[in-house]
Amino acid sequence: MADGALPTMSLKGKVSEAEWQARVDLAALYRLVALHGWDDMIFTHISARIPGPEHHFLINPYGMFFGEITASSLVKVDLEGNVIDKTPYYINPAGFTIHSAVHAAREDAHYVMHLHSDQGVAVSAHKEGLLPLTQHSLIVLPQLAYHDYEGIALNLEERERIVADLGQKKLLMLRNHGTLSVGATAAECWLGMFFLERACAQQVMALSIGRDNVLLAPEAAQDEVRKQIGMGMGMIGGLAWPGCLRKLDRESPGYAD
């Protein structure tokens, strides 16, 4: 167990191999977000669908910091918000609203990540949204959609609008709120968010010198990048993911407990 992690009974060997792997990968995502400083204490969430017809998914125990989360501490719920297995923890209602919406609507959305980073929230509140300023932004823009702010996501009726605005894209800017990434794998979900968060940070820094002083990427270059990334984040993410896990093993061990 990692230093500082809350005590949790290990579920290894007590759940299916598929569920255990989803738990380990999801716990890794939480730890990676914490390592990059993109967490917001207990107030954002990442989820993973468990393979199987039940459409159960895993999400963080409400009250646990991202750097404390382990594979065994994650909470399993159904699409109605019912906790499936006995646990001392419960879940964030706003997290359930957002994540249940995407998991129910998108079969390819095995992992869903929602963050409130400073740079992500800042760009979500910018009237022009994410601008084609950098290579990072050009990579994510073709997969980026927008959802207008409706208040804290406690209204279950908002789920339909979140899903409609996301459509078949992989990334969503929640206006005045934050960012969201979906992926068929933990690696794809992570890499999409990594590029989006980097693009947002770069935009905030660039605009600090004034909107009139920044140079947008030429239209031809934007089109070229769109063609070049046709292979998607899945393959690239698969190449980067093992290195991410090695970094966790060095700097945040215990996530797979």
Curated annotation (Swiss-Prot):
Stretches of the chain forming a coiled coil according to its record: none
Cofactor note: Binds 1 zinc ion per subunit.
Domain of life: Bacteria
Keyword entries, A-Z: Metal-binding, Zinc
GO cellular component, one term: cytoskeleton
Residues the record lists as binding Zn(2+): 114, 116, 177
Protein name: Putative aldolase class 2 protein CC_1201
UniProt source species: Caulobacter vibrioides (strain ATCC 19089 / CIP 103742 / CB 15)
